[in-house]
């Protein structure tokens, strides 16, 4: 293809999170840089139906079609599309290939006792040794453990959320491997479905379609199936469809002295490596080995993240923006309370404000009352948690290299207070941005698939030259604060 034709290739990243989704358009310029532009944004969320919290897949499909229609109206007649979403949730198809019912959201309470009950018949240590994935009650394996047997019996196929959307648009059913690793059903060594786990669940392997790697050409958008929409000609590419996998691919890390935090509803803190770390210590610390693009491993810890402040803002009826909450927090004294940000009680409480206050009351601490105090409590403790986990990361992997740079990407990278706190508490340089790392990772994987970019290092160089980042140098805090925090965490775990 001629150079001028390559420059005009249009790529679309469909990036859907728990609360919103968007379609981002990108092209690669002659100077090697890439552009990125939001074309369509829409709300997402789960709703109560038939006793469960569910995702509205029909609404998501409709919004994506509206966005693609906007793309066509911009004069773009041909494009490539990649889809990423959150992990672990799944759609069940009936014998005719239609959705059995709306998929149940991972925050639904149905799996509250799943880990305990599962462990009565299957060792959690063995589960970790087989899969390398941290034990979390909402993982696909535990959702399937509590799934209604009648629904499973009626299902012909199981598709993860991005794969279902790809199936709707192309008619091709696959499961993308990086996202499949979050199911906790794949063997870390063989990279195939673990038959012993499937037997324990009473599930046949035929329920799962073919596993494919990121960069696989899925197929063309079946425009004839959507006559009510004026759509462009599009080719779907299966990218690293778990949003964290795309975010890390979209992180501008060079060399081997860096770690990352993909900062959004969850904070995913880890390193990129090529080997799994499956040990008794990693199991105890609940670290995970999720698969990444091009044979990489994301060894990371899931931390509750911006969910805490999102829920505080929601229960204040969004009286304050996130920037305003951070500004209020900055005026408050630091480290007045210690909390375990990963305590399960914060996963989906009725009211995050009262839950945080109850936690502080129960642990005989000063109770945060004002919006600024609540925000300060959250940001201080996220920074403390990040710092402790960075140390554990080095210990668990036995890495000789010193982590000198922490790349913070995603929406949370815009939080200047938290970035500086993290640099200070962890005593590392924080490199914040790009905020659009998920969409960028999605887009760049497409460009690798089409041959516009050679590999992941080339993609990251492209990010560095295209998007500025903000550097936060460390002003180390009094070490006794961190010592007190760690002592508190040790007591609270007893």
From Swiss-Prot:
Its cofactor is Mg(2+). It catalyses: L-rhamnulose + ATP = L-rhamnulose 1-phosphate + ADP + H(+). Its EC number is 2.7.1.5. The keyword Manganese does not apply. This is Rhamnulokinase. Disulfide bonds join 360-377. Substrate binds at residues 87, 242-244, 302. It comes from the Bacteria. The active site is at residue 243. ATP binds at residues 18-22, 265, 310, 411. Belongs to the rhamnulokinase family. HAMAP family: Rhamnulokinase (MF_01535). The keyword ATP-binding applies. One of its GO terms (biological process) is rhamnose catabolic process. GO terms for cellular component: cytosol. Keywords: ATP-binding, Disulfide bond, Kinase, Magnesium, Nucleotide-binding, Rhamnose metabolism, Transferase. Pfam families: FGGY_C, FGGY_N. It comes from Enterococcus faecalis (strain ATCC 700802 / V583). Pathway: Carbohydrate degradation; L-rhamnose degradation; glycerone phosphate from L-rhamnose: step 2/3. Involved in the catabolism of L-rhamnose (6-deoxy-L-mannose). Catalyzes the transfer of the gamma-phosphate group from ATP to the 1-hydroxyl group of L-rhamnulose to yield L-rhamnulose 1-phosphate. One of its GO terms (molecular function) is rhamnulokinase activity.
């Amino acid at each position: 293809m001629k150079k001028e034709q390559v420059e005009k290739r249009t790529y679309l990243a469909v990036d859907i999170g728990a609360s919103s989704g968007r379609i981002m358009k990108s092209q690669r310029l002659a100077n090697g840089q890439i552009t990125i532009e939001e074309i369509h944004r829409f709300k997402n969320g789960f709703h109560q139906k038939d006793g469960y919290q569910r995702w509205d897949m029909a609404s998501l499909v409709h919004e994506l079609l509206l966005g693609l229609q906007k793309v066509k109206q911009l004069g773009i007649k041909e494009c490539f599309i990649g889809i990423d979403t959150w992990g672990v949730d799944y759609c069940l198809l009936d014998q005719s290939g239609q959705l059995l019912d709306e998929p149940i959201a991972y925050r639904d309470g149905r799996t509250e006792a799943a880990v305990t009950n599962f462990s009565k018949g299957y060792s959690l240590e063995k589960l970790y040794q087989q899969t390398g994935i941290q034990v979390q009650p909402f993982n696909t394996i535990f959702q399937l453990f509590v799934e209604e047997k009648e629904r499973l019996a009626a299902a012909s196929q199981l598709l993860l959320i991005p794969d279902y959307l790809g199936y709707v648009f192309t008619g091709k059913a696959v499961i993308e491997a990086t996202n499949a690793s979050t199911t906790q059903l794949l063997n870390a060594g063989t990279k195939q479905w673990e038959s012993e786990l499937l037997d324990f669940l009473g599930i046949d392997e035929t329920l799962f379609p073919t596993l494919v790697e990121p960069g696989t050409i899925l197929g063309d958008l079946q425009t004839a199936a959507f006559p009510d929409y004026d759509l462009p000609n599009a080719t779907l590419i299966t990218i690293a469809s778990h949003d964290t996998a795309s975010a890390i691919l979209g992180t501008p890390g060079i060399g081997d002295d860096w770690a990352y935090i993909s900062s959004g509803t969850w904070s995913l803190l880890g390193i990129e490596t090529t080997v799994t770390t499956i040990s008794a210590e990693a199991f105890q610390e609940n670290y995970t080995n999720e698969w990444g693009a091009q044979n990489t491993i994301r060894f990371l810890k899931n931390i509750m993240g911006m969910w805490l402040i999102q829920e505080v803002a929601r229960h204040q009826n969004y009286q304050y923006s996130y920037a305003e909450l951070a500004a209020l927090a900055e005026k408050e004294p630091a480290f007045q309370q210690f909390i375990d940000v990963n305590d399960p009680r914060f996963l989906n409480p009725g009211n995050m404000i009262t839950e945080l206050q109850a936690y502080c009351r129960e642990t005989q601490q000063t109770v945060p009352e004002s919006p600024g105090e609540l925000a300060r409590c959250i940001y201080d403790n996220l920074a403390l948690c990040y710092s402790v986990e960075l140390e554990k990361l080095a210990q668990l992997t036995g890495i000789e290299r010193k982590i000198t740079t922490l790349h913070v990407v995603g929406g949370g990278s815009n939080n200047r207070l938290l970035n500086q706190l993290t640099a200070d508490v962890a005593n590392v340089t924080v490199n914040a941005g790009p905020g659009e790392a998920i969409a960028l990772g999605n887009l760049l994987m497409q460009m690798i698939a089409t041959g516009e970019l050679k590999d992941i290092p080339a993609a990251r160089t492209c990010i560095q030259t295209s998007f500025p980042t903000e550097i936060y140098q460390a002003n180390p805090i009094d070490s006794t604060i961190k010592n007190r925090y760690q002592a508190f965490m040790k007591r609270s775990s007893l």
